[in-house]
Design a protein with these regions (language model features):
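Cleavable N-terminal export/targeting peptides
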Residues: 1-26, 191-192
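Predominantly the C-terminal beta-signal and adjacent terminal strand-loop region
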Residues: 74-79, 86-88, 146-192
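Outer-membrane beta-barrel translocator domains and adjoining extracellular loop/strand segments
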Residues: 40-47, 76-84, 121-130, 134-136, ...
Length: 192
């Protein structure tokens, strides 16, 4: 029964995206890829992976749109003796600036940036009883849509900075956790 409901919901969402007027297009995105920690976060976390889901609104004849997305990240601890991973769940609200969205072009460059909440927690055998920590962060990046009518493939890279999201291993003070997810995915509702 649950699978039937999920399938019906997916069909309804695709129908809405396909039937939306040319004036504005609702877009649904799914993707995933690798996540690279940078700065002091790179001292405590190894390269990870992520999955992403998003919903966006992009007017057809206006370059500025809006996207809300959620990501799940998993990083290994840099110290090999620790049997644990960093788990991160984030939700962000973003402004999207799309360059030259004419229907004749199949490739569309865009800039994306916004703010959000990031929950970080250590998980695994050596992290039992670890507390989670939720902090504010910002992100900015760029991507490329490969449009195929109401379906598009995309590749995107963003720099994220979580204020107070990690600990400086030298001073043990709170530090900004920075990372760059590289996402490859599909978009329903128009890439062109």
């Amino acid at each position: 029964m649950r699978g039937l409901r999920s399938g019906a919901l997916g069909a309804v969402l695709l129908a809405i995206a396909a039937a939306a007027p040319a004036v504005a297009q609702v877009r649904f995105s799914l993707g995933g890829g690798g996540t690279l920690p940078v700065g002091t976060f790179d001292d405590v976390a190894g390269t990870g992976w992520h999955g992403m889901a998003a919903i966006g609104f992009q007017p057809a004849d206006f370059p500025v749109g809006f996207q809300v997305d959620g990501m799940y990240h998993r990083f290994g601890f840099e110290a090999e003796a620790i049997d644990a991973d960093w788990q991160m769940i984030q939700g962000t609200a973003n402004i999207v600036f799309a360059f030259n969205r004419s229907e004749e072009r199949k490739f569309h460059l865009y800039l994306i940036g916004g703010v959000g909440g990031y929950n970080v927690k250590a998980v695994g055998d050596d992290a039992e009883g670890a507390d989670s920590d939720t902090n504010f962060g910002v992100n900015a990046g760029a991507g490329l849509d490969f449009g195929l009518g109401n379906l598009a493939a995309f590749v995107e890279g963003r720099y994220h900075a979580i204020f107070g999201g990690t600990v400086d291993p030298e001073t043990l003070d709170d530090a900004t956790a920075s990372f760059v997810p590289i996402t490859i995915g599909i978009r329903f509702g128009g890439g062109s």
